[in-house]
């Protein structure tokens, strides 16, 4: 008995540092980014994943995106077509968020400046156009009045759905490129704010990277940008505290909050 | 006489019955009249119908057109525009919000004076912080349930020096730091152009 216990203990002691080392490797924000040749290169189609929550989270996410795509300042204007494929993640039963995402896509995709039109003439051969989007539903991590006891079960269901949706698009690669031009791969970027679904989806992405599933970690996929709610002035939210050392970028929207030296906190101006 | 709207929103997730009651109380309705409001529109939330109905019955007739609805799936944009007014026919009114960031942002973008009344009964009350921070910078009026008439007065002051949102960048040295969402996404994507 004692022998088995010692062996188990030794094994744990030996493998734990290796696992932790692996974790630090994949969780450091300085992990490798893929080299990209142009924003709309057909060989490197980009994939952006956006997580919407209910009520305030959705409102803030869309306010932030709307501000970015309609910005009068060309340096700050987000060109929606730079992201060939967009995946919107919503919680089950949240038809309002789905409606908002659809409205945004219909508004943002046709926005094009003179500069884009000019660029279109020159770079037509390498421009893959506006691409498309999809809205994916995942089960709720926790219903509003659900008892805490069953929360792990529903969270696990949500985690499994998140893993599935992250794996929905993967490609074989050739020299670091998609094997087929225009083929959608893992998300390049995950953009989220604080709903519970976001925490679970980010966890799912970390698990995939931990095991380097289909080379997602080697290829620098699924970089994560977390934007703390604008309503958080003095204290971080629970999701924020959980994710502050896990995401690649952790942005807060009030300068006084950035003074809290937590994880990767940074203040780059108000974003909504 | 031109109409003038007061639009009240209590939010979708946690209905704020006290706010519904407060805006239908006699002192507040009198204050509305004193500031020449003609219409009061209330979004009372999922389970707020009963509270709304009984408060309207108690208020009786008072010279203000009162209307209410549960929730609008199409969003609050329509009501915000109504409160913003259209010049001669409809004067610019006011928005009273439960301090949800969505409605505050909508009102700030449309530059309608807004009174923010946080629900102090909510457990995790970061909305008070938002209301305080925004009131300090004179973007909104921080209202209290007990004295909404005073807040209505303050809103008239706010109307005269309404600030625009998003805040304009001040100074060149700040622009280097403020790259916006696009700058951050570009950094993460590693675009070379």
Residue ranges, per PLM feature:
Chain A
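Terminal signal-anchor or tail-anchor transmembrane helices
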Residues: 1-29
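Active-site and donor-binding regions of nucleotide-sugar-utilizing enzymes
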Residues: 14, 51-52, 56-84, 92-93, ...
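N-terminal signal-anchor transmembrane helix
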Residues: 26-50, 59
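Phosphate-coordination/substrate-recognition cap region in phosphate-metabolizing enzymes
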Residues: 98
């Amino acid at each position: 008995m004692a022998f088995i216990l010692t062996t188990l203990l030794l094994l744990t002691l030996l493998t734990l540092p290796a696992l932790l080392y692996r974790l630090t490797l994949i969780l450091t924000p300085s992990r490798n980014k893929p080299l990209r040749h142009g924003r709309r290169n057909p060989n490197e189609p980009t994939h952006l994943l956006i997580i919407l929550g209910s009520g305030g989270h959705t409102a803030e996410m869309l306010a932030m995106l709307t501000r970015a795509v309609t910005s009068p300042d060309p340096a700050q204007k987000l060109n929606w077509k730079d992201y060939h494929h967009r995946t919107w993640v919503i919680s089950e039963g949240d038809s309002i968020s789905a409606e908002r995402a659809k409205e945004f896509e219909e508004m943002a995709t046709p926005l094009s400046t003179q500069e884009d039109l000019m660029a279109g003439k020159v770079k037509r051969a390498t421009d893959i156009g506006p691409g498309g989007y999809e809205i994916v539903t995942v089960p709720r991590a926790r219903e509003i009045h659900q008892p805490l006891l069953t929360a792990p079960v529903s969270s696990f269901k949500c985690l499994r759905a998140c893993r599935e949706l992250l794996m929905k698009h993967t490609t074989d690669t050739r020299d670091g490129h998609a094997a087929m031009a225009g083929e959608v791969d893992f998300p390049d970027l995950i953009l989220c704010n604080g709903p519970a679904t976001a925490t679970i989806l980010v966890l799912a992405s970390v698990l995939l990277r931990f095991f380097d599933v289909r080379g997602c970690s080697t290829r620098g996929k699924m970089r994560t940008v977390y934007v703390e709610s604008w309503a958080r002035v003095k204290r971080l939210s629970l999701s924020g505290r959980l994710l502050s050392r896990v995401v690649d970028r952790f942005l807060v929207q009030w300068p006084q909050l950035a003074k809290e030296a937590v994880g990767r906190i940074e203040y780059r101006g108000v974003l909504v | 006489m031109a109409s003038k709207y007061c639009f009240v929103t209590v939010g979708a997730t946690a209905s704020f019955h006290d706010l519904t009651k407060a805006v239908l109380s006699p002192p507040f309705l009198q204050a509305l009249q004193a500031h020449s409001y003609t219409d009061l529109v209330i979004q009372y939330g999922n389970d707020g119908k009963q509270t709304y109905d009984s408060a309207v019955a108690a208020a009786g007739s008072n010279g203000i057109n009162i209307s209410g609805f549960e929730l609008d799936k199409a969003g609050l944009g329509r009501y915000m525009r109504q409160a913003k007014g259209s010049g001669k026919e409809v004067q610019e009114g006011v928005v009273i919000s439960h301090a949800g960031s969505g409605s505050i942002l909508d009102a700030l973008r449309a530059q309608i004076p807004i009174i923010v009344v946080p629900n102090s009964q909510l457990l995790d009350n970061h909305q008070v912080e938002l209301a305080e921070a925004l009131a300090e910078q004179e973007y909104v009026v921080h209202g209290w349930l007990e004295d909404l008439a005073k807040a209505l007065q303050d809103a008239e002051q706010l109307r005269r020096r309404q600030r625009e949102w998003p805040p304009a960048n001040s100074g060149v040295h700040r622009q280097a730091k403020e790259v916006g969402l696009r700058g951050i996404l570009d950094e993460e994507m590693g675009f070379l152009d």
